[in-house]
Amino acid sequence: MWTDRLYRVEPYRMLFQWVKDEGNGIYSVGMASILAALAYPLYSIKIKPVGTKLEYDEALAIIEAGKRVATFPTPLSGIVVDVNEEVIKNPELINKKPYSSWIAKLKATNLEEVKNLQSAKEIVKTVKDFIILEDVDCSIVEE
């Protein structure tokens, strides 16, 4: 399931996101499993409303996890066309099933940015090294 996506991985920012092409310039955006494990337990998520225009790296959502509140930046410039009401009601879905619990869908406004994303194969070593370095417990993640 995680291999059919592209990724934005910036370990120094503890940023691990997935992006899935839904066709017609629409992209689903979610939290990769390592970030879902780091953000356990996720208490709340506030997602920008449908119609919001965002530039690359602007806050797509605000997440509250443990004792932290952090922004979840957008990996692509675009317009929010859908938000996942289920994860707003039950944020812990992201912790347990990060690849089926998308956060928002964007209509991309700069398709060149997609070229900056990486395949699952390209991120494996970086993610494994980070898990070892930070001693990340990914056991909460079911998928």
UniProtKB/Swiss-Prot annotation:
PTM annotation (N6-lipoyllysine): residues: 67
InterPro entries documented for this protein: Biotin_lipoyl, GCV_H, GCV_H/Fam206, Single_hybrid_motif
Listed GO biological process terms: glycine decarboxylation via glycine cleavage system
Matching SUPFAM superfamilies: Single hybrid motif (SSF51230)
CDD domains from the UniProt entry: GCS_H
Pfam families: GCV_H
Keywords in alphabetical order: Lipoyl
Domain Lipoyl-binding: 26-107
Cofactor note (record): Binds 1 lipoyl cofactor covalently.
GO cellular component terms listed in the entry, alphabetical order: cytosol; glycine cleavage complex
Summary of subunit composition and partner proteins: The glycine cleavage system is composed of four proteins: P, T, L and H.
PANTHER family: GLYCINE CLEAVAGE SYSTEM H PROTEIN, GLYCINE CLEAVAGE SYSTEM H PROTEIN-RELATED
Function comment: The glycine cleavage system catalyzes the degradation of glycine. The H protein shuttles the methylamine group of glycine from the P protein to the T protein.
Identification of the protein by name: Glycine cleavage system H protein 1
Organism: Aquifex aeolicus (strain VF5)
Chain's gene name: gcvH1
